[in-house]
Amino acid sequence: MQINISNLDVKNHLDKFIEDRLEYEFCKQDKYLYLENDNLKLHYNNKELFIDFNDSEILNRINPKTKKCSVVQAIEGRSKAKLTILDTTAGLGRDTFTLAARGHTLLTLEKDSYLYLLLKDALQRAQQINYLKEIANRITLINIDSNEYILTTDKSFDCVYVDPMFPPRKKSAKVKQGMQILHQVGFNDEVSNSNLLDNIIQTQISPKAVVKRPINAEFLSNKKPSSQLKGKTNRFDIYSL
């Protein structure tokens, strides 16, 4: 069932700004939101995107018995403190949810309004599940461009996380359908991403920034990090500011 945003109520938490902004856009045939069994989904170019924090992949990531993933290692370092983290690029919300499961408090930004609504719906569903409720409640989600937020907020954070979303390379292996849509819908251009790191440094919003990059990519904004955590296909550039 295709629906207009004016008829959409994601558990009574949609704001009027989003409603007015997207009422027409959600009616496009190649890109629209729809409800299926009370779950909000995105149809885009004959593909479907649905975000669920109760799926097996997420549950495995947040299992205390699972080895800490790279993003957790990069952001926590040797600290055992519970951090306030600004996630500037929410995407599918997996890193955000993983960090919140570690006890950290997240303010998460997503500029794409489709992804924002999918994430909001997913968080609200997680809040209804006993073993996920506490995690979901540590996450605050805002629909805004990251550069705009950083330049206008008076808040500060223990760490800022940046995961620039670039279109996949033509030679890269096929990725999951959800990631394919994310690459097409949620990526920023290189100038915006470079400006983001520059603005983080300029505003002194945090003493630490962590930037996720493809393993062989150049430094964001040509700025050499203080340290790095490398994996097989990507790395985390860590900036002490």
UniProtKB/Swiss-Prot annotation:
Which InterPro entries does this entry report, sorted A to Z?
Answer: 16SrRNA_methylTrfase_J, SAM-dependent_MTases_sf
Enzyme Commission code: 2.1.1.242
Species the sequence originates in: Francisella tularensis subsp. holarctica (strain LVS)
Q: Name a single GO cellular component.
A: cytoplasm
UniProt name for this protein = Ribosomal RNA small subunit methyltransferase J
What Gene3D superfamilies does the database record attribute to this sequence? Vaccinia Virus protein VP39
Q: What class of enzyme is it?
A: transferase
Where is this chain primarily localised? cytoplasm
Q: Main role?
A: Specifically methylates the guanosine in position 1516 of 16S rRNA.
Catalytic reactions on record = guanosine(1516) in 16S rRNA + S-adenosyl-L-methionine = N(2)-methylguanosine(1516) in 16S rRNA + S-adenosyl-L-homocysteine + H(+)
Q: Which residues bind S-adenosyl-L-methionine?
A: 94-95, 163
Annotated keywords? Cytoplasm, Methyltransferase, rRNA processing, S-adenosyl-L-methionine, Transferase
Family, as annotated: Belongs to the methyltransferase superfamily. RsmJ family.
Cellular localization per UniProt: Cytoplasm
GO molecular function terms here?
rRNA (guanine-N2-)-methyltransferase activity
